[in-house]
Design a protein with these regions (language model features):
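Actinobacteria-biased recognition of intrinsically disordered, low-complexity terminal regions
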Residues: 1-10, 189-194
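Helix-turn-helix
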Residues: 15, 19, 23-57, 61
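Solvent-exposed, amphipathic alpha-helical segments
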Residues: 19-26, 69-76, 154-161
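Basic/polar, acidic-poor N-terminal "presequence/leader" segments
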Residues: 51-66, 70-72, 78
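Hydrophobic alpha-helical connector segments
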Residues: 61, 72-104
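Helix-loop "lid/cap" segments that line or gate small-molecule binding pockets
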Residues: 92-99, 110-114, 134-135
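Hydrophobic/aromatic-rich alpha-helical bundle segments in the mid-to-C-terminal region
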Residues: 105-106, 110, 117-194
Length: 194
């Protein structure tokens, strides 16, 4: 006799996160209610409330899922020498993180005013600043420091700007990474010239 399939708690949590993020992106964080999220999921508000008490709880859980890979990247990078190869590997790994969390990063960029007021805003700001610090050499000429940090931020801007450009998403991702790698290599080249 077949047993009925009951979604595991983690599956429900993940579905709530996906639906909420889609609604936040469609109509904005402020304009989305828990009731709308529950309706889209075809569950009661009480069932949704069992998993998350507020919209911020949902968003914080999504951000926490993203924060761990970034913390792992920071921990790895802090144990490495600040060489061009390390910086390039940071960019490659960060590209993977961005790629797998593209919807969240788009949401953050499109809802900056709302995000700034939430815990996720501070978390994102802190981890991005830490990555930026790892990318630059404090004793380097200012132009080299700017190039190194711009390499990181060009990946954010590239994701946002290139999303409406025709083409294969993987090719766009590769092109964005190529530009970031070029910027950090140029920063290192300027260091060896000076």
């Amino acid at each position: 006799m077949a047993t009925p399939h009951h979604p595991r708690r983690g599956d429900t949590r993940r579905r709530i996160q996906e639906v909420a993020l889609a609604l936040f992106a469609e109509q904005g964080y402020e304009k989305t209610s828990l009731r709308e999220i529950a309706e889209r999921l075809d569950v009661t508000k009480a069932a949704l409330y069992y998993h998350f008490k507020t919209k911020e709880d949902i968003l914080s859980s999504i951000a926490e899922d993203l924060a761990q890979p970034i913390r792992d990247l920071l921990a790895w990078a802090e144990g490495q020498p600040r060489t061009l190869a390390t910086k390039q590997e940071v960019l490659r790994r960060y590209s993977d993180i961005l790629w797998h969390s593209a919807d969240l990063f788009r949401f953050i960029q499109e809802n900056q005013a709302s995000v700034r007021e939430l815990t996720i805003g501070e978390t994102f700001k802190t981890s991005t600043a830490a990555l930026g610090d790892l990318m630059k050499d404090p004793g380097a000429p200012l132009a080299a420091q700017v190039r190194s940090v711009t390499a990181l931020f060009s990946m954010h801007a590239g994701m946002f700007v290139m999303r409406n450009v025709e083409g294969d998403p993987e090719e766009k991702r590769a092109a964005i990474l190529e530009v970031a790698l070029d910027l950090v290599a140029q920063a290192e080249t300027n260091l060896s010239v000076n």
